[in-house]
Amino acid sequence: MTKVGLRIDVDTFRGTREGVPRLLEILSKHNIQASIFFSVGPDNMGRHLWRLVKPQFLWKMLRSNAASLYGWDILLAGTAWPGKEIGHANADIIREAAKYHEVGLHAWDHHAWQARSGNWDRQTMIDDIARGLRTLEEIIGQPVTCSAAAGWRADQQVIEAKEAFHLRYNSDCRGAMPFRPLLESGNPGTAQIPVTLPTWDEVIGRDVKAEDFNGWLLNRILRDKGTPVYTIHAEVEGCAYQHNFVDLLKRAAQEGVTFCPLSELLSETLPLGQVVRGNIAGREGWLGCQQIAGSR
């Protein structure tokens, strides 16, 4: 039996309003619990369009057929008008998710975090995280115990900033296995549970065709030597590609693969490491990557 952490990122208003309810229904039918990370502030995701001037981002948008994958409402959100606030407008949906699944913070403003957090000072970062946590806690009526940095934009600055909130774990980076990042003080910080597997948009049209993706991914899962963690998006697997996700769950069950919330992957003893800036094939720009202590 292979156990895989299932992480669901919710980036947009439409993903919350339409994608999450569909995913909740699918997961219920398959008796699966997951970790769902919500963006709760303004939906300004359309402001990423300026990144089309970067060849790597343009190629990603073309090979993943972004217009049909996400929809024009997502691609244009917050461009010519202020982005709609996601959280309180979809509070009932978020509360429903929290009844059955582990719920954490993805971001206050997903676009702002992904585009600008790498240049923020620590207090600006702390204030932004606090705003998101406060909003999510108001919605679900209980403390938030986990978070996942938008776009995996995380480095030592993010690790230090999040220590102020005493969360149970964070999932801010890409890597191979859960670990504790070393702080500037030399002490181990809050546990990190890295994503180990590629997302749909990172590999479609580059490594694999859409119709072959599920078999390709299951092969990666079964060969994973670490602690497998897979991320889906409410805007993708909860909308245009929900049928592909259902097929993945059916095929996974046949292969003895089970999915669980990320917290079930934690153990009392974890290796030490760091989160450093790196690059992942198929994703434009830098992102946080796990580095085991002592390695370079």
Swiss-Prot record:
Keywords, in A-Z order: Antibiotic resistance, Hydrolase, Lipid A biosynthesis, Lipid biosynthesis, Lipid metabolism, Lipopolysaccharide biosynthesis
PROSITE patterns referenced in this protein's UniProt entry, alphabetically: NODB (PS51677)
Recorded superkingdom: Bacteria
E.C. code: 3.5.1.n3
Reactions catalysed, as given in the entry: 4-deoxy-4-formamido-alpha-L-arabinopyranosyl di-trans,octa-cis-undecaprenyl phosphate + H2O = 4-amino-4-deoxy-alpha-L-arabinopyranosyl di-trans,octa-cis-undecaprenyl phosphate + formate
Pfam families, alphabetized: Polysacc_deac_1
Any single Gene Ontology cellular-component annotation: membrane
InterPro entries found in the cross-reference section: ArnD, Glyco_hydro/deAcase_b/a-brl, NODB_dom, Polysacc_deacetylase_ArnD
Keyword NADP: no
Domain NodB homology, chain residue ranges per copy: 2-260
Molecular function in Gene Ontology: hydrolase activity, acting on carbon-nitrogen (but not peptide) bonds, in linear amides
UniProt-listed GO biological process terms: 4-amino-4-deoxy-alpha-L-arabinopyranosyl undecaprenyl phosphate biosynthetic process; lipid A biosynthetic process; lipopolysaccharide biosynthetic process; response to antibiotic
The keyword Lipid metabolism is annotated on this UniProt entry: yes
Family per record: Belongs to the polysaccharide deacetylase family. ArnD deformylase subfamily.
Role description: Catalyzes the deformylation of 4-deoxy-4-formamido-L-arabinose-phosphoundecaprenol to 4-amino-4-deoxy-L-arabinose-phosphoundecaprenol. The modified arabinose is attached to lipid A and is required for resistance to polymyxin and cationic antimicrobial peptides.
Protein name: Probable 4-deoxy-4-formamido-L-arabinose-phosphoundecaprenol deformylase ArnD
Organism: Escherichia coli O157:H7
Protein's gene: arnD
